[in-house]
A protein has these predicted regions:
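Membrane-anchoring/interfacial helices and their immediately flanking loops
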Residues: 1-82
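Select subsegments of transmembrane alpha-helices in polytopic membrane proteins
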Residues: 31-32, 89-98, 304-310
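Aromatic-anchored segments of alpha-helical transmembrane domains
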Residues: 34-46, 98-106, 321-322
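Transmembrane alpha-helices and immediately adjacent membrane-cytoplasm interface residues
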Residues: 56, 63-85, 90-146
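A structural signal for short, hydrophobic/glycine-enriched beta-strand patches
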Residues: 101, 118-124, 128, 132-296
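Membrane-embedded alpha-helical hairpins and interfacial helices in multi-pass inner-membrane proteins
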Residues: 294, 301-305
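C-terminal single-pass membrane-anchor helix
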Residues: 304-322
Length: 322
C-alpha cells in the first residue's frame, strides 16, 4: 500500500511539472519525456506486484523499448566509426548501448530476486535512467520526422541557429541548415527575412552569423533581407537575441520558422516557446553517421535544461523510494 501511494505521488507531481513545462515550452517533446518515463516506471512496478502473466508482459514491453533504442544507437555508432573512424562520441555510444540493455534488466532482476534496501534503490534508479534515455531518443526522433516538411502557412521570418565553421565558411553540417532555409525562403516567395544567429567561438576567425550571411548572399538572398545576430553562444541565446532583433527591425508578433538540424529541433522549439516566439520548426536532415552523436548530445542538453522543472519529482523518487 505504501509503495502504491508513493508511486501515485510521483505521478501526481510529474503531471503538475508536465503542465508547467507544457505551458512554458508548448509542443516541445521534452515536456512529455519525463512524464512518460514516470508512467512506464510506475506501471512496471505495479505490474511486478500482480500475477505472473501481467508482470511478464510489462517487463517485456519495457525491455523492448530500451533494447530498440540500444540497437538503433549501436547501428548508427558502427556506421559512424566505419565512415569517420573512432571518436569520443562513438566510443561513448559503444558504452551506452550495453548500459541501456543492462539498465532495462535491472528492475525485473531486482524484483524477481526480491532485493531490498540499497540494492533495490540502485536497480530502480538504473532502470529509470534506461527508460529516460530510450524514451528521450524515441520522442526526439519522432518530433524530427514530423517536422521535415515546410509549413503550410506563410512565415515572416526564418531563424537559422549557427554551428561550427571551417575557416570562414560554414561546415557541411551548417550548410545543410542554410540550404534548408533557402528552400523554405524560395517557397515563401523570396521576400521573407532571415535571421542568422551565432557568435564567434574561440577557435573561429569570424562569427557564425557573418559566415552564414555571406553564404546566403552568394545564393542570391538580398542583404536587406538578412539580419545578423552575432552575440549568441547557446541555443537559448540564439532564440532570445533573435527575438530582440526581430522586434527591433520588424516589430512584435511576427510568424517565425526555426530551421535547424532535425535532432536539434526539440531544443530550438523549447527555447523559442520560452521566449514567446510564434514559431514553427523546420528540420534539415542530418547525415546518417551523425545520428548517434546528435541524439546523445541533445538528450544530455535537454535533460540539463529541464532539471529545474522536474527536479522535485526526481528528488522525491530518489529520497522516498520504498
Amino acid at each position: 500500500m505504501a509503495a502504491m501511494a508513493f508511486e501515485l505521488l510521483v505521478l501526481l507531481v510529474c503531471i503538475i511539472a508536465y503542465a508547467i513545462c507544457r505551458r512554458r515550452y508548448l509542443d516541445s517533446p521534452v515536456c512529455a519525456v519525463p512524464l512518460m518515463t514516470a508512467i512506464t516506471w510506475v506501471l512496471e512496478r505495479a505490474y511486478a506486484r500482480a500475477p505472473q502473466s501481467p508482470r511478464l508482459g510489462a517487463v517485456i514491453i519495457c525491455i523492448l523499448i530500451c533494447w530498440r533504442c540500444a540497437g538503433s544507437l549501436a547501428l548508427h555508432v558502427c556506421t559512424s566509426m566505419r565512415t569517420r573512424g573512432p571518436s569520443v562520441i562513438a566510443c561513448l555510444g559503444c558504452v551506452l548501448s550495453p548500459c541501456i540493455v543492462a539498465c532495462s534488466l535491472a528492475l525485473p532482476v531486482a524484483m524477481g530476486a526480491k532485493w531490498h534496501g540499497a540494492a533495490l534503490f540502485c536497480a530502480n534508479a538504473l532502470h529509470a535512467c534506461g527508460l529516460w534515455f530510450s524514451l528521450s531518443i524515441a520522442a526526439f526522433d519522432r518530433y524530427a520526422r514530423t517536422h521535415r516538411c515546410n509549413p503550410k502557412d506563410c512565415v515572416d521570418v526564418i531563424i537559422v541557429p549557427g554551428a561550427a565553421l571551417r575557416g570562414s565558411r560554414p561546415s557541411p553540417f551548417l550548410a545543410s541548415r542554410l540550404e534548408r532555409a533557402l528552400e523554405l525562403w524560395r517557397e515563401q516567395g523570396c521576400c521573407t527575412h532571415i535571421v542568422v544567429s551565432g557568435g564567434q567561438g574561440s577557435d573561429e576567425c569570424v562569427s557564425e552569423a557573418s559566415a552564414m550571411h555571406r553564404y546566403l548572399a552568394e545564393q542570391g538572398v538580398p542583404d536587406g533581407l538578412i539580419i545578423d545576430e552575432s552575440h549568441s553562444t547557446t541555443t537559448k541565446e540564439n532564440m532570445r537575441y533573435s527575438r530582440q532583433l526581430i522586434e527591433e527591425h520588424l516589430g512584435a508578433g511576427m510568424r517565425v520558422a526555426v530551421v535547424s538540424t532535425d535532432y536539434h529541433l526539440p531544443r530550438c522549439a523549447m527555447f523559442a516557446a520560452s521566449e514567446g516566439l510564434d514559431a514553427v520548426s523546420v528540420g534539415a536532415s542530418s547525415a546518417h553517421r551523425a545520428w548517434s552523436r546528435g541524439y546523445i548530445r541533445e538528450t544530455v542538453a535537454l535533460t540539463r535544461a529541464i532539471l529545474p522543472t522536474y527536479g522535485i519529482p526526481i528528488l522525491i523518487a530518489l529520497v522516498c523510494m520504498p
